[in-house]
Design a protein with these regions (language model features):
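Short helix-capping segments at alpha-helix termini
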Residues: 12-19, 48
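EAL-family c-di-GMP phosphodiesterase catalytic domain
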Residues: 3, 21-34, 48-156
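Conserved functional hotspot residues or short segments at active or partner-binding sites
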Residues: 41
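A short, hydrophobic coiled-coil helix within the histidine kinase transmitter core
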Residues: 4-8
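Conserved hydrophobic residues forming the short capping helix/wall of the S-adenosyl-L-methionine
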Residues: 9-13, 101
Length: 156
């Protein structure tokens, strides 16, 4: 993977420094399949400047020991955890997971935010950002560039 990314960057004539603008999402199940091998690859990707986010956290067999060793910048909480917000036990578990991720210094992103109750809970617990239909509908591929331009114009 490291070689493939490096090759694409060189082939496109992209300055290597631009890699710091790219965030790579890696699924939890992939990292936990061979964590030792994954750690070595993640360290190389980090050295290239890539930001690395663990995707689908809570959907598989995460290990706190590995979570603290991986050179991550963020963790995306699986939508199944977010869906259960409002149930006391689920709220406690999700709150604890957010506290743990934040204690490790990673940004937190919640996937599948579809209700105001979910958004309010996540804000209260200090979740950094969210993804879901409540916040924005999926954008068709052919409209992405114009939506990004509009967003940039609104920020200016």
């Amino acid at each position: 993977l490291v070689e493939q990314i490096t090759t694409v960057v060189k082939d496109q004539g992209m300055p290597i420094e631009m890699l710091s603008m790219i965030e790579l999402d890696i699924k939890e199940e992939l990292l936990m399949k061979h964590p030792e091998r994954a750690l070595g690859q993640l360290e190389k990707l980090q050295q290239l400047g890539l930001r690395i986010t663990l995707d689908n956290f809570g959907s598989g067999r995460s290990s706190i020991a590995w979570l603290q060793r991986f050179p991550l910048t963020g963790v995306k909480l699986d939508r199944r955890l977010v869906k259960e917000i409002g149930e006391q036990k689920a709220d406690e578990v999700l709150g604890a997971a957010l506290s743990l991720i934040q204690a490790l210094g990673y940004t937190t992103i919640a996937e599948g935010v579809e209700t105001q109750q979910q958004l309010d809970f996540l804000k209260q617990k200090g979740c950094d950002s969210g993804l879901g239909y409540l916040l924005m509908n999926p954008i068709p591929e052919n409209e992405i560039v114009s939506v990004l331009h509009q967003r940039d114009e609104q920020r200016a």
